[in-house]
Amino acid sequence: MVYIPSLEKPRVKETCTTHQPVVICIDTSGSMNEKAEDGRTKIEIVEQMVNSLSKIDLSESEKGAVDICVLAFDDECRVLQDWIPLSDFKGNLKLDAEGCTALGSAIIDSIDATRARRRAYQAPDYGIDARRAQIFLYTDGISTEDMSKAIEYSQDYLNRDKPSAKLYTILI
């Protein structure tokens, strides 16, 4: 899948001058149904972690300056929540796990989402400053697809786009 941004004017809190774009990318492959040490499934743990962002201890102004997009991937990558200010995130995601692990596609789509958001910030009628994008990738395993395209795409992105994004991998 190729990330296709909404054609609507991006939702941002107008009172914030500098924004922090954050992509949350969640592995929803079948292996995420495995039980963790505490008896919950891995997907339940990630669901709780991501949903808890709605209750994060930040001021409304700080929450308004963080824009999030939530992606999920198994056999393919899909948008669960298109870009919204963190202050508008309800934390009511319900995740199901099945399929393979299209990790390479998830990385490419996460990069594309950050590029799309940066273009929206830089639109003539917006002119919003942005911090370096953050991508948080929650996964438990190894990709079931060839990673060479994702590696090449990532290297090109890091060399061409300034500022690029930081990618954090959270192993479950």
Regions found by a protein language model. Give the residues of each.
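DG-centered beta-turn motif at the end of beta-strands
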Residues: 26-29, 46, 70, 110, ...
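Acidic, polar low-complexity linker/tail segments
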Residues: 1-40, 118, 122-125
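Short beta-strand-loop
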Residues: 64-94
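…and closely analogous acidic/polar surface helices at protein-protein or active-site interfaces
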Residues: 19, 30-65, 161
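Extended, compositionally biased accessory segments flanking or bridging domains
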Residues: 22-25, 42, 46-52, 80-89
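Surface-exposed acidic, glycine-flexible loop patches that form ligand/cofactor-binding
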Residues: 12-16, 55-62, 113-129, 159-161
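VWA/integrin I-like adhesion module and closely mimicked acidic/polar interface patches used
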Residues: 141-172
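Von Willebrand factor
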Residues: 78, 90-131, 145, 168-172
